Regions:
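Charge-rich, solvent-exposed alpha-helical interaction surfaces
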Residues: 89, 93, 105-108
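Short N-proximal segments of mature Sec-exported proteins
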Residues: 21-92
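Contiguous, function-dense segments enriched for cysteine-driven chemistry
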Residues: 14-15, 115
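Boundary at the C-terminal end of the N-terminal hydrophobic targeting segment
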Residues: 16-20
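C-terminal partner/receptor-binding element of secreted or periplasmic proteins
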Residues: 98-124
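Sec-dependent N-terminal signal peptides
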Residues: 3-14
C-alpha cells in the first residue's frame, strides 16, 4: 500500500504546480493526426473526430467574435465562406503543415479567409 501512496502524492504535487493551460481540447490536435484520419473531400461529418474538430474550430471562431465585438466592435462573418469551405481549409492547412495544430488552422481561417466586419463595440 505504501508503494502506491508515495507515487500518488508525487503525482498530486506535480499537478498542483503545473503550468497554466491556455488552449485545450481539439485545438491541440496535431495536423498529422487529423489528416491521417480525414480524407480530403469527405466533409467534416465523416467521423466523430472530424465533427469534434470542426465543432471546436466553430467554438474558437465564435469566442474570438465575442471578444472582438466586446472590445472593438470587430468580428469575423462566419457565413462569408461556407462550412464546407471552412472544413476544406482546415484539412488543406493541415496537409501543408503536418507539424501544425488545429488551432493554427483556425487562426489562419480568421486571418485569411473570413470577411471581417465592424459594428458598435460593447465595452462594459
Amino acid at each position: 500500500m505504501r508503494l502506491f501512496v508515495v507515487p500518488l502524492v508525487m503525482l498530486a504535487t506535480c499537478v498542483a504546480h503545473a503550468e497554466p493551460i491556455v488552449v485545450a481540447g481539439m485545438g491541440t490536435l496535431g495536423c498529422a493526426t487529423l489528416t491521417a484520419q480525414a480524407p480530403p473531400g469527405s466533409g467534416y461529418g465523416q467521423s466523430s473526430l472530424t465533427m469534434a474538430v470542426f465543432s471546436w474550430v466553430q467554438g474558437y471562431l465564435s469566442a474570438w467574435n465575442v471578444v472582438g465585438i466586446m472590445q472593438s466592435g470587430r468580428f469575423a462573418d462566419l457565413t462569408s465562406i461556407s462550412t464546407n469551405e471552412q472544413w476544406a481549409h482546415i484539412v488543406g492547412f493541415c496537409q501543408r503543415n503536418p507539424d501544425g495544430f488545429v488551432l493554427d488552422a483556425a487562426r489562419e481561417i480568421l486571418a485569411t479567409r473570413l470577411k471581417m466586419e465592424t459594428g458598435a463595440a460593447l465595452n462594459r
